[in-house]
Amino acid sequence: MKKLLTFIMACVISLGATAQISEKAFEKWHQNKYSMFIHFGLYSELGGVWEGNPVTRGYSEQIQSFAGIFSDWYGDTALRFNPTLFDADAIVSLAKEAGMRSIIITTKHHDGFCMFRTATTDYNSYDATPGKRDFIKEM
């Protein structure tokens, strides 16, 4: 019964949650319509393959869950994550040339890896990788 009441309270409380951006800002973004969405993160290093075998369940960014990879093994992927061909200027130019008005990029996925430098964790693209890059700042 306690679990049910806790669940109901959580639902009720979440109804009062407010957006992190203003309604005006959201409306402006929504009117842009044509945007680039970039799904990029530590999982990109694996390319949907774990230990030489393709992981066909789920999406590539879900590889840790669907391949049953332990957190420390998955975390070791950061030691070789060095996307030297990532070119923020080229990406922005491509989006502009295509008439896109905004770019949305994954800053932190459910694996917990941050694509930006942060003081809250070392598990990020600057502190945990050989490339020492803040991809969000570059964008």
Describe each PLM feature range.
Residues 19-139:
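Mature catalytic domains of secreted/periplasmic carbohydrate-active enzymes
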